[in-house]
Amino acid sequence: MHEIILCKLGEVVLKGLNRRSFEMKLMSNIRRRTQPFGKFKIYSRQSTIYVEPVENTCDIAGAYAACKQVFGIIAITRALPCEKSKEAIFDTAKTYLAGALTAAKSFKVESKRADKTFPMGSIQLSQWVGGALHDALPHLTVDVHHPELTVYVEVREDAAYVHGPAEAAAGGLPLGMGGHAVSLLSGGIDSPVSSYMIAKRGVQLEMIHFASPPYTSELAREKVLKLAQELTPWCGRLAVFIIPFTEIQEEIRRKCPEDHFTLIMRRFMMRLADMLAQELRCRALVTGENLGQVASQTMQALAVSEDVTTMPVLRPLIGLDKEEIVKIARKIGTFDTSILPYEDCCTVFTPRHPKTKPSVEEAREYESALDVEGLCQRAMANREMIRVKPTF
């Protein structure tokens, strides 16, 4: 028998009558992600998705790494199926896990008997296989509390499966089951992390980025596209809509008080993101805002910036410390790109003393000096859409 991948389901098992649609979507996502590594048979049984190679040329290691990044899988392991007999299970464990068993000093066997027709109980099977392994490998001691290695045996309806400890996978919900949203993507640390966290809840994303040439460089643009590409293993295929923002920022600088520059700029960003979301039939906006992290992210300022939207604004980072955000950025592979020293439009015309407790009435009054509708229409008319090539 060939080695296979076992993908353990997370929240999907709690979905009741909708569970099957979540499983089908998850299997579709796994199929898409494993396609570059060969032909695999993908099916679901007993709260586990099986990824089984059809050809000897399949890259099982590559498929395993890809599956670890698929949302909806809580744990993952490579396993070897065998005949459902205690002798076959022992032989498989001894050969398949030979390297780990040789390296370990202590071990235990943990069995699960999903097939209740199997003649031995779970504890009996663990004791028998553990005893046989101990006899075959005398250097091993049995430690049921703190073993260096746990040998797992799963007796299912179709076969028995032997594997070592499972690894944590991406968790969350299958991508595409949580709706469709527009995510505001800057060149910083926060917005890629917020995009990842919302995608983890099953939301398919479109990205919007605001560029202000000549104040922002071509390198800043390339940085954002690279960030989007680094998100594709988690978020799937992405389109980045680049909105020209120079005219809007220059008009704000000319006609609005300096302490309101950032706030009114944010309101324009939210307007434009809302317009794009409506056009694409998205149901929410996603930002990397974090309560109190900077002066423009007070509770009052957040309320003023979202005053111009027609749909929910999702802020997954709202209660995280910066250190927590950085940790996630490192985990998903965006941190090194985020800290490249290329300025984005958020750093253009930054006020010396931004307003921290603004009001909607003030913002609307200052915006009355601007041709809000005309500025937005011209920006949207001159936008650019770039489909980011996935890294998988």
Regions found by a protein language model. Give the residues of each.
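Active-site adenylate/phosphate-handling loop in enzymes that bind or generate adenylated species
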Residues: 131-133, 139, 166, 171-178, ...
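Small/polar glycine-rich anion-binding or flexible loop at a beta-alpha turn
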Residues: 293, 341-349
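Structural beta-sheet core signal
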Residues: 183, 207-209, 242, 287, ...
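A conserved beta-strand->alpha-helix junction
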Residues: 227-254, 344
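A short alpha-helix-loop-beta-strand transition element characteristic
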Residues: 333-341
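RNA-binding accessory domains that recognize and position tRNA/RNA substrates
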Residues: 1-182, 192-238, 307, 355-360, ...
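Conserved G/P- and acidic residue-centered "switch" motifs that form tight phosphate/ATP-binding loops
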Residues: 188
